[in-house]
Design a protein with these regions (language model features):
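Aromatic (Trp/Tyr) and acidic
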Residues: 206-248, 256-259, 267, 312, ...
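Short Pro-Gly-centered flexible turn/kink motifs
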Residues: 139, 280-295
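Bacterial N-terminal signal peptides
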Residues: 7-16
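Low-complexity, Pro/Ser/Thr- and charge-rich linker/hinge segments at domain boundaries
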Residues: 163-170, 300-319, 388-426
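Extended, loop-rich substrate-binding clefts of extracytoplasmic carbohydrate-active enzymes
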Residues: 73-144
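Beta-strand-rich N-terminal accessory domains
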Residues: 22-91, 184-230
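Carboxylate/His-rich catalytic cores and anion/metal-binding grooves
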Residues: 485, 523-548
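Acidic (Asp/Glu-rich), glycine- and aromatic
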Residues: 136-186, 385-397
Length: 844
């Protein structure tokens, strides 16, 4: 929803954007700008995530992106993207030239998510140039497109559906409305997949090469194919206008050559966008595409200030600081008001001029400190016409409905090999009871790869019994990665040790495979979840004789499945729909898992002694048998630390003491966990060496934390940074707990506030779904097709549209902004809340 604008601006909008002369300039940041409208060209590098090519930001909202040559009418995540070779921005001529080519051999049948390129080879340049109040986009090819690909190759511009549903469009003289769902009819054509490139990576091992028969499987629907069936265009013409009724979103594209066609990408990808497309004509090279994009620039528009606070609130003893994000052209710094909400309405609790912090990304920032306000109650901050969400100040602010949804909802919903009920509701039925078969040797999807050897007694395709127990689905994809399974159990174990979590709202029966949300069973929920993680790791080790790399579905049709996890397979072991189990030789991951299991063993003692003993046994074995190299030494130290804390055995202590110089030189990675061993070992020389290194590390953190108005190290790249910031705060707790004279609590609180809403951009939602006054209630989880959420899941958060636009869209299909994950996504958040609760109550 568009944010309300200042009254003056609203009164002027009816006159359109022609009050003053408009003129796009190529600014110092490398994109075209005129007041509140920006046109980027190939700044972003993530086209499969709808971040790339030519992009258009209209008055604070990214409405179009991925303007580039594509080989399908409506490509998705799995379709070929070009290789970007060079980008040259020339402020003197107001031009950005980008040089690209097809195919990209580094992605063909290899890589994290392999693609299949057709046998089509050409180079091209995309030229974007400011022309007064418009941007001209031209495309030049180095050769004509072969006849068999005419109609397949075209220039696409993707339009963000979330802001356009129900909005009008015009194509020449025809008008229409962007529909909520994709509507037929469909068109059929010969797919590029039938002309696939036969290039073989002769220099790559078998685990770096995809299996075309599996990846490109023919027959029923396969997401790797996006051009055999597409939506019929909603309209065709030469001049297309988006939102002719809205001066804030209106822009026009005129094609001086090929006809424009408006497609709906959701016809063959549920997560697709609307696509405006012009095909490359036969024989064309020079100006094969020639578009003039004319955005409506509202000259009087200015970004409305955004008041950023925690959506939950603050403990009275907690430092309290609101961040106010304003347009860098806005020179009017006003006083801010803090109101207390009473039964009689608002009462002014404080009025104060915020301090100017300076510029970060594209905005100017102000800081409003109200730490002196300690009276319990409901509050709201006003700055000009802008209001924060309502928040609490109270000693009990973290006592209910803040960390608890992680245990009450998110972790139970994510449990694999279970049926999960919530009273009337079934979150998912019995699932993946047919886990698993041994993977084939190949480069699979989502980063999975199996080498020439299975590293076990099992051959490719063999049934591996005993894997259908425990674990949690990776929230978007349903797979089980070793680091997410053991890592989740580890973080929960550390939370139990640090805070003694006593909470029971869920019944979990591992024998009957039934989980009942809000049906207490007299057992600790957090320990039952630690047990759930331990079960899959230990079962995998016992079945395979080693750790699994992960368990994932065998093909893309299963991988993109939306909905009930129980629908992915038939739960009958030994047939073609079974998931695959992968193995690897990865010393770092094996030793990290050893560290996790050592901690798990501690907390399960007395709760599930058998599992506790097995966890420690496997941890010891991994520590002894895993070869250590330069890349895995940190993990060896981590394993030794946790094993020493669990066993107090001298050999682990001696190893740590012998490595004190290495530990000191890598203190930024090791410092957070070594402190507990430092205390327990009580070795003066070791402690002194570490403290010198820690003091230097503290200085580096303070320097980075000072780079942003949020008081934490934060250097956005592409993905939302919420998970990394949570992890930073989690580690800061251990540094503070071990070395309180060096590391204060501010970073813990600042990291928590960031996740709960005090973060860049106009969307100040809490990243924790269902937590706070406004939260991310559209998430990339199992129910994303319904534009819904899982309470207690924590999304990735505000992303960066390069080079400087912070964005958090209300849209369920952008994994880099709204995905939930295991192995820290929610558990680091829960830990942070528990840490704040403990620290603040201690000083009450």
């Amino acid at each position: 929803m568009m944010k309300p604008l200042f009254p003056l601006i609203i009164s002027l909008l009816t006159f359109g954007g022609g009050l003053y002369a408009q003129n796009f300039q190529l600014n110092k940041s490398g994109y075209f700008q005129d007041k509140g409208v920006d046109v980027m060209a190939f700044d972003d590098i993530y086209p499969e995530g709808h971040q790339g090519g030519v992009s258009l930001i209209m008055h604070g909202h990214r409405i179009a992106t991925n303007g580039d040559i594509r080989l399908e009418e409506t490509p998705g995540q799995w379709q070929p993207v070009p290789k970007q070779r060079e980008r040259i921005a020339d402020p003197q001529t107001g031009t950005i030239k980008t040089y690209l080519s097809y195919p990209d051999s580094s992605r063909h049948m290899t890589g994290f998510n392999p693609m299949i390129y057709p046998d089509l080879h050409f180079n091209y340049e995309v030229i974007t140039k400011a022309e007064g109040n418009a941007i001209r986009v031209t495309v030049n090819l180095d050769r004509p497109i072969p006849s068999e690909y005419i109609g397949k190759v075209g220039f696409n511009l993707e339009l963000f559906p979330g802001i356009l549903f129900g909005k009008p469009w015009l194509m020449d003289q025809q008008g229409g409305i962007f529909p909520r769902q994709a509507n037929g009819p469909t068109l059929e054509s010969r797919s590029n997949a039938t002309r696939s490139w036969d290039y073989i990576h002769s220099d790559k091992s078998i685990d770096k090469q995809a299996n075309k028969d599996i990846l490109g499987r023919q027959g029923d629907y396969n997401p790797i194919v996006a051009d055999d069936i597409v939506s019929a265009p909603y309209s065709t013409g030469h001049t297309f206008t988006v939102c002719p009724d809205d001066p804030l979103l209106r822009f026009t594209v005129h094609s001086e050559g090929s006809e424009l066609k408006l497609y709906d990408g959701r016809m063959n990808h549920n997560n697709g966008w609307f696509v405006l497309r012009a095909e490359i004509p036969a024989g064309a090279t020079k100006e094969a595409i020639n578009w003039l994009i004319t955005p409506n620039v509202v000259q009087v528009w200015i970004y409305q200030p955004v008041v950023q606070t925690s959506q939950v609130g603050y403990h009275p003893n907690q430092p309290k600081k609101a961040i106010i994000e304003i347009d860098k052209r806005d020179n009017r710094i006003q006083k801010a008001q803090l109101y207390r909400l009473t039964s009689n309405g608002k009462e002014l609790a404080m009025e104060k001029q915020p301090e100017s912090w300076g510029q970060f990304l594209r905005y100017h920032y102000l800081s409003l400190d109200f730490s002196n306000i300690k009276e319990s109650g409901l509050y709201q901050i006003q700055y000009g016409e802008s209001l924060s969400s309502v928040f609490r100040i109270d000693k009990t602010v973290y006592d209910r409905g803040v960390w608890q949804p992680v245990l009450e909802y998110f972790l139970p919903v994510q449990m694999c090999h279970m049926r999960v009920n919530e009273k009337y509701r079934v979150w998912h039925d019995f699932c993946h009871m047919d886990d698993a078969r041994m993977a084939q040797s190949m480069n699979h999807i989502d980063g999975y790869a199996q080498g020439a050897s299975t590293l076990t007694r099992f051959k490719p395709g063999d049934v591996v019994p005993g894997l259908n127990i425990g674990g949690w689905h990776d929230a978007g994809d349903f797979d089980l990665r070793i680091e997410s399974q053991s890592g989740e159990a580890y973080i929960l174990s550390l939370a139990q040790e640090a805070f003694g979590v006593d909470y029971d709202a869920t019944s979990i029966d591992q024998q009957k495979r039934i989980t009942e949300i809000h049906q207490p069973d007299g057992k600790s929920d957090i320990l039952q979840q630690v047990e759930n993680g331990a079960l899959t790791v230990i079962a995998g080790y016992n079945a395979l004789g080693r750790l699994y790399r992960g368990i994932i579905c065998k093909d893309l049709r299963q991988y993109v499945m939306l909905g009930d996890a129980g629908a992915m397979t038939d739960n009958q072991l030994g047939n073609e729909d079974d998931r695959w189990v992968f193995t690897e030789d990865n010393p770092s991951r094996e030793l990290e898992t050893a560290s996790h299991l050592a901690a798990v063993s501690r907390v399960l003692k007395g709760f599930n002694d058998t599992l506790s003993i097995q966890a420690l046994k496997i941890s010891r074995e991994l520590y002894e048998i895993t070869k250590v190299d330069n890349r895995s030494k940190n993990a060896k130290i981590h394993a030794a630390t946790e094993l020493y804390l669990t066993t107090k055995e001298t050999k682990y202590k001696d190893y740590l003491l012998a490595e004190k110089d290495y530990i000191a030189s890598h203190i930024d990675q090791i410092g957070w966990y070594i402190g507990r061993a430092d205390k327990a070992m009580n070795d003066r020389s070791f402690s002194e060496t570490l403290r010198k290194a820690l003091a230097d590390y503290k200085g580096r953190i303070e320097e980075q934390g000072g780079e942003t108005p949020y008081g934490i190290p934060y250097r956005p790249h592409i993905w939302g940074a919420g998970w990394n910031i949570q992890e930073f705060g989690f580690k800061q707790y251990f540094l503070h707990d071990s070395y309180p004279d060096l590391f204060k609590t501010d970073y813990i609180y600042n990291a928590l506030n960031f996740v709960l809403g005090c973060h860049p951009g106009s969307n100040t939602a809490s990243f924790a779904s269902g937590v706070g006054a406004v939260s991310a209630t559209v998430g990339y989880g199992l129910n994303r097709a319904d534009w819904s959420y899982i309470p207690g899941g924590v999304i990735s958060g505000t992303a960066l549209i390069r080079p400087d636009f912070p964005e958090l869209l209300t849209f369920p299909f952008l994994w880099q902004q709204t995905e939930y994950v295991l192995g820290g996504g929610s558990s680091h958040y829960m830990f942070l809340v528990l840490a704040a609760q403990k620290l603040l109550n201690e000083h009450d």
